[in-house]
Amino acid sequence: MKTMGITGGNGFIASLVKEAMQSTMEIIPLTRKELDLGETAAVRSWFNTHDYDYVFHTGAMAQTADCENHPELTHRINVDGTKEIAKACKEKNARLIFISTEQCFNGKTEEGPFTEDTPLCSVTAYGNHKAECEAFITSVLEDYIILRFSWMLGMSRPGIKASPNIIRNVMNAMFYQTPAKFTVNEIRGMTYAQKLADVFDKIIELPSGIYHVSDTNTHNTYESANIVAQKLGFTQEQIDACILPNHERYADRFRDYRLDTQKLKAHGIDFGTFEENVDACLKDFGWLK
């Protein structure tokens, strides 16, 4: 049985993938307790002294504010730690599966969707961290998978805590009758994370390269929030009272983060439309029949 180490081992994506893969692969989940990615010497030591066939590197400090306010710490975790893992994978002849992000394109002024070959342009520290990691991985390794994620959605359940996402945000607004604003100046993919976990066995065997993981979405974030609320059964009057358009955020420049996914589709992996992803999530958790 092959072995896969997973950094960020108790995170949302890591937990789903561990659950999906643990019957066919030995999984070594590495949480911050076992390995602090900010301690480069410890990262180097662990990956040089353990055996593994794959590393799924999900661990990172992904909050934009943290990256902007603590540039040295977050660079050490997000970039320096990744470089140590990549170098170890080369020595061990192990395949690195690295999570990157749509935020590598957040400085683009043209419309998406963007392909894997589109030049990167980020205006945030987090996006630049991921771009720097991508450049290092592609220059050092021959055997790697870089997955640029859209915004991943889902819901929490015992043992797995979902990351903040549009479904949770809409539910909080509607069920607690707490009005929330959603920007009209942004369009992005929003993909049900379980769909990724369900095909992860295929993803880790893809040819080496960069791949975009995203649904297809033609709605801005405010429109997307409306769709979620409608699927939850609320009337438009109820929705209009709690799902509010935010015209101020990104008023300087419309953000288009959409990712072109034709490359993955050519390998038989298709994450479908935004509506299909929301339906799948709500059905899995009993909110839709």
In which residue ranges do the predicted regions lie?
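NAD(P)H-binding glycine-rich loop region in Rossmannoid oxidoreductase-like domains
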Residues: 40-77, 88-90
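N-terminal Rossmann NAD(P)H-binding glycine-rich loop of SDR-like oxidoreductase domains
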Residues: 2-21
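Catalytic helix-loop patch of NAD(P)-dependent Rossmann-fold dehydrogenases
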Residues: 76, 81-84, 104-147, 152-153, ...
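Adenosine-cofactor binding site in Rossmann-like domains, unifying the SAM/SAH pocket
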Residues: 26-45
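Mid/C-terminal beta-alpha module of Rossmann-like enzyme folds, strongest
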Residues: 199, 203-250, 289
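NAD(P)-dependent short-chain dehydrogenase/reductase
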Residues: 138-188
